[in-house]
Every structure is written in structure tokens, then in C-alpha cells.
């Protein structure tokens, strides 16, 4: 009897176990591409991948999309005009259109006339619309990956906590576009943090300062009482000296010497205010007094130069508890600066903007912290949801960019050598907030303080970001975007800005989509195939912007490829010579450089070439493999002269179908 009872109990235990197992089975969602982080880079990656036909999950920890541009309120674009291309150009064009319809200028920041700024909520609205129109993109907010499954050296899936519930996301390719590089760390891929490499992380290493911006505006009809800072916030006196040395009531005008005036401060990060009918131009100082909306993001870097620490510890990235504490301290510093504005600077009718839509999710539980008394909550609740993070974990990729890759000629405004595998452009000068002494840089990469140029005089200049920095050295199924690409700390000082992160995000999205389309791992792709998609999206990849080859011309992509792979030379820095008529000697030399061919059909080398003659010549040249190239050859007809632009386009078409491409550096 006792044995029978045991068997019955065991049976019911098994039934309960099976039932419990199914009850706890995770919901699974399947996608082609999963983008972790909906910042500037993540949104661009999702848009590009969706436009290429992918199903995309865009997973974001906060309740905002747009990252540093919106959720961190760095909505004054740090561009130098030459990176206005691709999805970034689409985005700022929509920003201009939105404000133009409201008779409001966007060129009101950075003391310049050719600038772009917007309100964070407007930036988010535009990104959401771009994502909606891109294709199949599911935006999952307030969602955080907790674990990553890797089998056979490939990222397969990730468990994501969504509204307190764990959901399994499976994808063919994952992209880490988080603000901190958190997904890379979960994946097990090696990464750099400060000047050390995982898993041997030096806890004494440092990263750049963070900043907790705040959108503020002038309340001309009177400041709501709850938006007045009620007494000096904790730590105020610790920051007062720095505040006074940066901005003072009777400070200098721009350009000038520190400290600067409140008017100069407001013009630095000024953003549009459609309720203000004044005509404002960032390049005209006489209009700056009319600015009624700006962002606190100048004297409030955290930790700044205060205290004994030389910079922010890498624990900010590695330790959730330290991250939360540092974030709250950064909030306090910004609150202190707002108090300084309302008191010493005499800006008593200025405070946080109550119409940006902030106040939902926050990256830190500041409201439960004893250092934030109840009287500050009405103001802090209108702060952005998370800080501006300048330096994240950085993937160890197939290759790592160093300062040598971004040394630019001041006169030409670009690097002197081209990278054949370029997938994005950068332009910003090297800007490191904090210490850049050699002991804080990567010795294994040969980075030293002495090698860092002072490139602010030339306003930076163009450089290229190649395919290999997006792909892990070993792990498959994963790509990096945002500030997480494979670069040194010094290079991150130039690649962390919004225009660059949008362009590198677009590149990562193209790599991921092409990987799925071709059914190979990202590292197995031919960069030219990815470049072709980016050119289709009007994303410029070369160092040149020729006046005779605009991006809407038939020869533009061919000219881009010719400059990347070095098989043709331009007439000048500004003109390619698209309409120049080609001689056989020039055709021969181009094919030698582009395809490595040495033997050619006989022709009179000094004779001009017609398109039909070129077609016949190609049939003889590729006779042994004619099927491969026939489609390109059939598109060449007519007795018109073969132009340089037509030759460039034809060579690109041939390279696309060629069995392999030979890098010409």
C-alpha cells in the first residue's frame, strides 16, 4: 500500500513538473536583426536594416528613443557640415522642415550660422516617423537584456526583461547600440574599457566625464513656483568655483576669454523655441539675447576636475551600483548649476522646460535617494531620463582604429590616405573630456598623449571608419554600433558625436541586413556589397565631394568606388573630371589598378574610346568568363565617347560581379 501511494505521488509530481515547465517557458520572438539600444546609432541601424527588407527588433532600456540626441538632451548637432550624408542628412532635413513650417530657425547654436538644433521631443518624433516608414520595426521600450545565449561561437538569442517579464529574442544578427556597451559585455566578446581589455579590467582605469544635461527655458510670464530651486542643492559649494570660472554675470562675449556671460552660455547650446517669434541666428551675436530655450551642458561635466579622481572610473560601466551613484551625483551637479543661474547669474525666470515629455523612466532611482529632498522633485522630474555618456565599452574588432587613422591635413581638411573598406565618415576634432595622459591610454595600441594632434584649428576634417571595426575579432552573430565600435579612447573622442553615431549605426544596419540576405556571417561579407547598399542610400563613404559628381548623378557611386579603391585619380580636389573623354591608355591603366589585369586586347593607346568599342573590348577581355560579366557588357551601347564617369561606373559594376576584389591602398 505504501509503495502504491509513492507511485501515485510520483506520477502527480511529474505532471506538476511538466505543467510548471510549460508555465515558465519563455515567450520567444524571432527577428532577422535585433538592435539593442535605440539611441542615435540604434535607430539608424534599425532604419537601414528595415529598408533592406529585414524584420527588426529595436530594444531600448529607457522610454525614449534617440539616445544622446533626445533622451540625454544633446540636441545641438556636433557636425562640421561634411558628414551631412546618409540617414543623418535625412534626419536633419526633416528637422529643418519641421521648424521651417513654424517659422523657427534651427541654426541658433554653437555661435554659428551653419548649425542644427532641435527640441528633444521633436527629434524623437521624427525618428519614430522614420522608423515607422522604414519597414517592419518593432520598438520595445523599457526592456533590458539580462543574458545572452552563445552556441558554436555565435550569438543566438538574448533574454530580455520587458515590463518585468522575461522574453526570449532570437535573431540572425544582434547589434549592440547601447549607451554603455552592455550587450557586448553579456555576449562574452572581448571589449576595451578605459585603457584595459576584458576580462583583465584595470579598476584604476578611467573614461571620459559624463554630463547630465537639462533643457531650460525662459518663463517670460513668470516662473512657476515649483520650478524655482529651493535653496542650494547638496554639494553646491564644491562646484561653485568651477561655475564662476566658466560663466559669470558680467563675463566675456564670444569669442573671448573665460569666464563668459550668460548670453554666451545660452547661445552655445541654444535650441529652437516655436513660441518665440524673434529672428535668431547663431552666427549673429546681436540676436543671442532673444534666445529663450537652451540646454545646460557646459560647466557641469561629472566629475570634472573636482576632487582627487583624475576622471570617471571604469566602474561607471562595469558596476550598476557605481553607475547609479555617479548618475545621481551628475544630476545634483546640474541642479546646482541651475541654482547658480537663478541666483548669481540673475536668470530668475529660467528653469527646466516642462514641455519636453520627460518624467517617466529614469536610469537611476534618484527619487528614493536621501540627498534629493522633496522640494527638488518638481525640477528633477523634468530632467532627461539618462545622462550623456561619452565613452562606453568598445568592442575588440577585427581591427581597431587608432589616432594614426584620423590624423588630418589641416589644409585639405581630411586624412591623406583612403580606406577601401570605408562604411562611414567622421569629421569632429579629437575631444576628450578629462585626462588624456599616456598612462590613461592604450599602450598596446601605441597610443600616447604626444601623438594626439591639436586639430581644433582646422576644425577636425574628414576621416573614414572601415568595415572591420564593426565586427568582433572572433564572435559571430554580433556587431557594434554607437560608441561601441572598435576604436581607441582617442579615436572615440571623434567618433562619439551624433552625426558619426548615426552614420556608423546605418553602416551596422547594412552589414546586418546583407549578412542575412547572403546567409553568411558578417565577417564573411565583401565590404563592397555593403558599400553598394550604403551608396543606394546616398551615404557618402569617400573623402571627396566632387562638384561634377553629385550624389544624384549616374556616376556618383562609381566615382565613390574609384576613390575608395584607388583605381582612378581625380582632376583636382574639387573635380573628378566626370565628362573627360577616355583614351585606351587610360582605360588600360584603370583595369590594371582595379582588377589586377596585365594582358589586354591590342588597341591604339592614344586613341579615344567610344562606348561601343569599349563594349567589344570587354567581350574579348573577359572571353573566358563571359557569362559572369555579360550583363554589364550588354548595358554598354552607342557611339558616344566613353567618359571618365562612365568608365568609373562600369568598373564598379564589374567589381560587383567579380569573384573577389583586390584592395588597392
Predicted feature locations:
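N-terminal Rossmann-fold NAD(P) dinucleotide-binding loop
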Residues: 42
Amino acid at each position: 500500500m505504501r509503495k502504491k501511494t509513492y507511485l501515485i505521488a510520483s506520477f502527480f509530481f511529474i505532471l506538476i513538473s511538466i505543467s510548471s515547465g510549460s508555465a515558465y517557458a519563455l515567450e520567444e520572438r524571432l527577428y532577422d536583426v535585433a538592435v539593442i539600444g535605440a539611441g542615435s546609432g540604434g535607430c539608424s541601424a534599425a532604419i537601414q536594416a528595415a529598408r533592406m527588407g529585414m524584420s527588426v527588433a529595436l530594444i531600448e532600456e529607457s522610454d525614449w528613443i534617440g539616445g544622446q540626441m533626445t533622451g540625454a538632451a544633446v540636441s545641438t548637432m556636433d557636425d562640421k557640415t561634411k558628414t551631412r550624408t546618409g540617414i543623418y542628412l535625412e534626419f536633419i532635413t526633416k528637422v529643418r522642415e519641421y521648424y521651417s513650417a513654424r517659422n523657427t530657425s534651427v541654426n541658433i547654436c554653437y555661435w554659428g550660422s551653419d548649425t542644427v538644433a532641435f527640441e528633444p521631443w521633436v527629434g524623437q518624433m521624427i525618428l519614430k516617423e522614420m522608423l515607422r516608414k522604414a519597414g517592419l520595426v518593432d520598438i520595445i521600450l523599457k526592456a533590458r537584456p539580462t543574458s545572452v545565449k552563445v552556441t558554436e561561437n555565435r550569438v543566438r538569442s538574448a533574454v530580455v526583461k520587458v515590463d518585468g517579464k522575461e522574453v526570449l529574442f532570437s535573431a540572425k544578427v544582434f547589434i549592440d547600440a547601447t549607451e554603455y556597451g552592455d550587450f557586448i559585455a553579456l555576449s562574452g566578446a572581448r571589449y576595451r574599457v578605459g585603457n584595459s581589455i576584458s576580462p583583465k579590467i584595470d579598476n584604476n582605469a578611467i573614461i571620459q566625464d559624463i554630463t547630465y544635461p537639462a533643457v531650460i527655458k525662459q518663463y517670460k510670464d513668470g516662473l512657476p513656483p515649483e520650478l524655482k530651486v529651493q535653496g542650494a542643492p547638496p554639494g553646491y559649494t564644491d562646484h561653485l568655483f568651477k561655475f564662476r570660472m566658466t560663466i559669470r554675470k558680467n563675463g566675456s562675449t564670444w569669442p573671448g576669454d573665460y569666464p563668459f556671460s550668460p548670453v554666451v552660455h545660452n547661445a552655445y547650446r541654444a535650441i529652437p523655441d516655436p513660441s518665440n517669434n524673434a529672428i535668431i541666428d547663431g552666427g549673429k551675436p546681436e540676436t543671442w539675447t532673444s534666445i529663450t530655450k537652451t540646454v545646460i551642458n557646459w560647466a557641469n561635466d561629472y566629475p570634472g576636475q573636482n576632487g582627487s579622481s583624475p576622471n570617471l572610473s571604469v566602474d561607471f560601466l562595469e558596476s550598476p551600483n557605481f553607475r547609479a551613484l555617479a548618475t545621481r551625483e551628475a544630476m545634483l551637479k546640474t541642479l546646482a548649476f541651475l541654482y547658480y543661474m537663478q541666483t548669481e547669474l540673475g536668470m530668475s525666470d529660467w528653469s527646466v522646460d516642462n514641455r519636453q515629455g520627460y518624467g517617466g523612466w529614469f536610469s537611476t532611482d534618484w527619487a528614493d535617494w536621501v540627498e534629493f529632498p522633496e522640494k527638488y522633485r518638481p525640477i528633477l522630474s523634468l530632467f532627461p531620463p539618462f545622462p550623456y555618456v561619452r565613452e562606453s565599452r568598445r568592442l575588440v574588432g577585427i581591427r581597431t582604429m587608432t589616432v594614426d587613422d584620423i590624423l588630418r591635413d589641416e589644409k585639405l581638411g581630411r586624412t591623406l590616405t583612403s580606406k577601401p573598406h570605408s562604411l562611414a565618415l567622421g569629421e569632429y576634432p579629437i575631444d576628450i573630456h578629462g585626462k588624456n595622459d599616456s598612462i590613461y591610454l592604450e599602450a598596446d595600441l601605441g597610443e600616447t598623449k604626444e601623438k594626439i594632434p591639436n586639430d581644433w584649428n582646422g576644425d577636425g576634417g574628414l576621416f573614414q571608419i572601415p568595415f572591420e571595426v564593426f565586427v568582433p575579432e572572433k564572435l559571430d552573430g554580433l556587431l557594434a554600433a554607437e560608441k561601441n565600435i572598435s576604436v581607441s579612447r582617442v579615436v572615440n573622442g571623434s567618433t562619439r558625436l551624433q552625426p558619426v553615431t548615426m552614420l556608423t549605426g546605418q553602416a551596422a544596419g547594412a552589414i546586418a541586413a546583407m549578412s542575412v540576405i547572403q546567409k553568411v556571417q558578417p565577417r564573411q561579407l565583401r565590404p563592397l556589397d555593403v558599400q553598394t547598399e550604403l551608396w543606394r542610400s546616398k551615404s557618402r563613404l569617400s573623402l571627396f565631394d566632387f562638384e561634377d559628381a553629385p550624389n544624384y548623378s549616374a556616376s556618383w557611386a562609381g566615382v565613390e568606388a574609384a576613390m575608395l579603391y584607388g583605381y582612378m585619380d581625380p582632376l583636382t580636389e574639387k573635380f573628378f573630371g566626370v565628362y573627360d573623354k577616355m583614351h585606351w591608355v587610360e582605360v588600360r591603366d584603370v583595369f590594371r589598378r582595379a582588377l589586377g589585369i596585365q594582358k589586354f586586347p591590342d588597341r591604339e593607346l592614344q586613341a579615344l574610346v567610344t562606348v561601343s568599342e569599349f563594349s567589344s573590348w570587354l567581350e574579348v577581355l573577359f572571353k573566358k568568363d563571359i557569362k559572369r560579366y555579360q550583363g554589364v557588357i550588354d548595358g554598354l551601347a552607342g557611339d558616344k565617347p566613353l567618359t571618365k564617369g562612365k568608365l568609373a561606373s562600369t568598373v564598379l559594376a564589374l567589381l560587383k560581379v567579380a569573384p573577389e576584389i583586390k584592395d588597392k591602398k
